[in-house]
Amino acid sequence: MSKFVFVTGGVVSSIGKGIVAASLGRLLKSRGYSVSILKLDPYLNVDPGTMSPFQHGEVFVTEDGAETDLDLGHYERFTDTAMTRLNSVTTGSIYQAVINKERRGSYNGGTVQVIPHITREIRERIHRVAANSNADIVITEIGGTVGDIESLPFLEAIREFKNDVNKNDVAYIHVTLLPYIKTSGEIKTKPTQHSVKELRSIGIQPDLLVCRSDKEINEGLKRKLSGFCGVNLNCVIEALDADSIYSVPLSLKNEGLCKQTLNCLELEDKECDLENWEKIIHNLRNPGNPIKVALVGKYIELGDAYLSVVEALRHACIEQKALLDLYWISAEMIEEKSAEEYLNDVDAIVVPGGFGNRGVNGKIEAIKFAREKNIPFLGLCLGMQCAVIEWARNIAQLPDASSSELNPDSENPVIHLLPEQEDIVDLGGTMRLGVYPCRLQKNTTGKELYNEDVIYERHRHRYEFNNYYKQSFLDSGYKISGTSPDGRLVELIELVDHPYFLACQYHPEFLSRPGKPHPLFKGLIKASQEKLEQSN
């Protein structure tokens, strides 16, 4: 029988609930408990798949093909546990399910209301995660901030949830902010008191307070919060601003978050094994020489749009004992000026995924620069498609070569729509999504990096390499190092006479973990280090 932990946030948005939930998951797993983490998002979109990266950040893709909130990436990276579509719930998906049931007559003509129908559907989703994962502990993060009207059905649902299970099977954690007023030199607790008061008015009494602060919280403040908020003194947890998100589990462990959560759930506080995690933090805090990596994207104004790519680069640098020096380069800026102006001093170039025409020519110019100047390069999804277009235009002498997405009238569509996508009208949840196998070819860099015959990678795309141009591509110095098992789809390409030039149609960043960097990212950083050593 699973136990349940609910994580809410107060005072301000972006308080770090996702990192707290992921860190608790890491701490519980280090004690031998199995964990699954669920995100409840209070927006009306069915999923974030069609949302702008500028508004929502990256869309994280699960093994079973769900387009989810980026917090699921944190959950997977911290716990090294794969999540599924069940782990991502939005208000839109809840209402859609309830309305579909009403249309089918499932409510026997009854009046459908937020209470009990919407809240019951939410509770059923949480129970479904527990049943599907068979986890010892299910952690549920409630998106938004206590007091938001959008979050009310979720908060009511988790209030009701304690009636579904035994009292000691549920714990409520409230993440809040203690602002420091510089002029008075004081940390203020009043916003937290009001946030907890709001929770109590709904019927939820938090068991633990996780207090975000950039100043240390003294014993007196903890006692004050304990008294005003009705929380045991040992359950007032300090969460100071950290130098890295990966150091948060260790600081929360020292504050007793996991121990007190287990105490609330009446579970054994087993011996904790964080030795590998401590090694990761040691390498992170004691890096070697910097590696200057240019991330050439079209959504760089919001760093979260490429969150998993950045974390994958960080994991590789931690493993290789290098300092990640990340250059955020707008592809449109390269179009306006030149690749040389922005990329001349970098050690590696990454061109990530994206959609649409904007900035594509800048990406292509960056790839050309990497190819001609022998700069280690990694292309992801659209990055691979741009690498193929760059080859066609500059090596194969097909100046009008393009993708049928970018130029439907091109006479040389070296990238074209997957056949199964041709009759699809809806945008949401209809791409090639989730894990697919890829067979690696012998005597390729890809095979050497993975050291596997068949790999499994996550996808999110509609367009693929046009096999009509395959032989011409191979004859010009490129290798196709990975394909679908039937050989129909090109998944991984590489340039032969180059220090490191690989591009893949899939998204390897979703499978990178701290302590277990993805082979393609590790290979990129290693190649950059080797090239630097040779130049010195």
UniProtKB/Swiss-Prot annotation:
GO biological process: 'de novo' CTP biosynthetic process; pyrimidine nucleobase biosynthetic process
Similarity comment: Belongs to the CTP synthase family.
Activity regulation text: Allosterically activated by GTP, when glutamine is the substrate; GTP has no effect on the reaction when ammonia is the substrate. The allosteric effector GTP functions by stabilizing the protein conformation that binds the tetrahedral intermediate(s) formed during glutamine hydrolysis. Inhibited by the product CTP, via allosteric rather than competitive inhibition.
Cellular component, GO annotation: cytosol
Pathway, per record: Pyrimidine metabolism; CTP biosynthesis via de novo pathway; CTP from UDP: step 2/2
Gene3D superfamilies: 3.40.50.880, P-loop containing nucleotide triphosphate hydrolases (3.40.50.300)
InterPro entries (alphabetical): Class_I_gatase-like, CTP_synthase, CTP_synthase_N, GATASE, GATase1_CTP_Synthase, P-loop_NTPase
Species assigned in the record: Prochlorococcus marinus subsp. pastoris (strain CCMP1986 / NIES-2087 / MED4)
Catalytic activity: UTP + L-glutamine + ATP + H2O = CTP + L-glutamate + ADP + phosphate + 2 H(+); L-glutamine + H2O = L-glutamate + NH4(+); UTP + NH4(+) + ATP = CTP + ADP + phosphate + 2 H(+)
Entry-linked Pfam families: CTP_synth_N (PF06418), GATase (PF00117)
Active site: C381 (nucleophile), H507, E509
UniProt gene name: pyrG
Binding site for CTP: S13, D148, I149, E150, K188, T189, K190, P191, T192, Q193, K224
Binding-site residues for L-glutamine, renumbered to this chain: G354, L382, G383, M384, Q385, E405, R462
Residues the entry annotates as binding UTP: S13, K188, T189, K190, P191, T192, Q193, K224
PROSITE patterns: GATASE_TYPE_1 (PS51273)
Residues that coordinate or bind Mg(2+): D71, E141
Note: CTPSs have evolved a hybrid strategy for distinguishing between UTP and CTP. The overlapping regions of the product feedback inhibitory and substrate sites recognize a common feature in both compounds, the triphosphate moiety. To differentiate isosteric substrate and product pyrimidine rings, an additional pocket far from the expected kinase/ligase catalytic site, specifically recognizes the cytosine and ribose portions of the product inhibitor.
Keywords linked to the UniProt accession: ATP-binding, Glutamine amidotransferase, Ligase, Magnesium, Metal-binding, Nucleotide-binding, Pyrimidine biosynthesis
Segments forming domain Glutamine amidotransferase type-1: 292-534
UniProt-recorded name of the protein: CTP synthase
Residues that coordinate or bind ATP: S14, I15, G16, K17, G18, I19, D71
Region (Amidoligase domain) location: 1-267
MF terms in GO: ATP binding; CTP synthase activity; glutaminase activity; identical protein binding; metal ion binding
Function: Catalyzes the ATP-dependent amination of UTP to CTP with either L-glutamine or ammonia as the source of nitrogen. Regulates intracellular CTP levels through interactions with the four ribonucleotide triphosphates.
